[in-house]
């Protein structure tokens, strides 16, 4: 079972601080800014970004959560049986700049599904994508606005993000095709 740690806890902390600064630099009018985390690991990442922005600028940015599982294009797959989670967007996204947050950007299909789900909640001024890891292999024309780390990988390798809130520790691993789930 071959696995390699790509980012440790301190790397993730620094990376999220950098992304928060990039979000602030790009969005001077931060009163129009909201952050929405994609289930599962995008949710704690969204909360951490909002905490960083609060610490750096004293700005409290609204944070929501988005379950996009019913918008996926593989619902008819024999292998996929979604666990429905609670979408919680307790604010209007109309005319807001929505920063959509996910842990890994791979084919772009989850991002497409999340954008479809998000549009059911209103008409944002803009949608920006923040990801901890971009591993390439796009199948759809999707790119992230904020990238923690580009990790070129083989298609059969897996990127595993572990976060304290969901997994008890912070790290990003790359697993070969024989390593399976950790």
Curated annotation (Swiss-Prot):
Task: Place the motif PRPP-binding on the sequence.
Answer: 98-110
Q: What does this protein do?
A: Regulates the transcription of the pyrimidine nucleotide (pyr) operon in response to exogenous pyrimidines.
Q: Which PANTHER family match?
A: BIFUNCTIONAL PROTEIN PYRR
The top of its lineage is:
Bacteria, Bacillati, Chloroflexota, Dehalococcoidia, Dehalococcoidales
What is the catalytic activity of this protein? Answer: UMP + diphosphate = 5-phospho-alpha-D-ribose 1-diphosphate + uracil
Record-linked Pfam families: Pribosyltran
Known InterPro entries for this protein? PRibTrfase_dom (IPR000836), PRTase-like (IPR029057), PyrR (IPR023050), PyrR_bifunctional (IPR050137)
Protein name, UniProt field: Bifunctional protein PyrR
HAMAP family found in the cross-reference section:
PyrR (MF_01219)
Instruction: Please list the disulfide bridges.
Output: none
Q: Which residues form a coiled coil?
A: none
Picking any one GO molecular function of the record gives: uracil phosphoribosyltransferase activity
Say which species the protein is native to. Answer: Dehalococcoides mccartyi (strain ATCC BAA-2100 / JCM 16839 / KCTC 5957 / BAV1)
The Swiss-Prot or TrEMBL record describes its family as follows: Belongs to the purine/pyrimidine phosphoribosyltransferase family. PyrR subfamily.
**Protein encoded by which gene:** pyrR
Record keywords: Transmembrane included? no
Which GO biological process categories is it annotated with? regulation of DNA-templated transcription
Q: Which CDD domains match?
A: PRTases_typeI (cd06223)
Name the NCBIfam families for this protein: PRK05205.1-1, PRK05205.1-3, PRK05205.1-5
Record keywords, A-Z: Glycosyltransferase, Transcription, Transcription regulation, Transferase
Membrane-spanning residues:
none
